[in-house]
């Protein structure tokens, strides 16, 4: 019975690092899209951070960052009248065309098509 606390402490430590990572992504996803930034902030190697995240979330750090960018892009596309170009710049993309390619790769459709599809479904 005395050993029962050891695994939970490790689990709590891992969870704390994951929580810290999510908080960091939330704060910096617009300007920091590189795993190295987050691993440095958490004093872990990129490889170790990815191992922890993969075990906990089933995704890599980069996938979590991309998911957060797409979530914000979707919100802006649906709930604002901002242009795709403006949204791209606000999300830290220097080139709106690159943002559109990134979005299409992640979602399987362009930002404009997503916006159009969502506006059609709300009528």
PLM region spans:
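Basic, amphipathic alpha-helical hairpins
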Residues: 1-7, 22-34, 53, 57, ...
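Short, Lys/Arg-enriched anionic-surface-contact patches
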Residues: 8-18, 24, 59-68
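Charge-rich, low-complexity intrinsically disordered segments
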Residues: 32-35, 39-40, 44-67, 71
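Residues within helix-turn-helix
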Residues: 36, 47, 83-86, 96-97, ...
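Core residues of bacterial helix-turn-helix
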Residues: 42, 91-92, 103
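Short hydrophobic/aromatic patch on the recognition helix
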Residues: 49-50, 98-99, 103
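Terminal helix-turn-helix DNA-binding modules in bacterial transcription factors
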Residues: 55-94, 116-123
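…primarily DNA-binding HTH/wHTH and HhH modules…
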Residues: 101-123
């Amino acid at each position: 019975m005395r050993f029962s606390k050891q695994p939970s402490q490790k689990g709590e430590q891992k969870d704390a690092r994951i929580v810290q990572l999510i908080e960091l992504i939330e704060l910096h996803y617009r300007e920091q899209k590189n795993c190295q930034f987050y691993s440095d902030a958490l004093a872990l190697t990129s490889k170790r951070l990815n191992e922890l995240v993969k075990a906990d979330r089933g995704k890599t750090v980069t996938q979590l960052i991309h998911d957060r960018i797409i979530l914000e892009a979707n919100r802006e596309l649906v709930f604002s009248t901002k242009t795709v170009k403006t949204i791209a710049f606000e999300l830290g993309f220097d080139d709106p065309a690159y943002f559109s390619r990134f979005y299409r790769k992640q979602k399987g459709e362009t930002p404009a098509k997503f916006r159009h599809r969502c506006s059609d479904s709300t009528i």
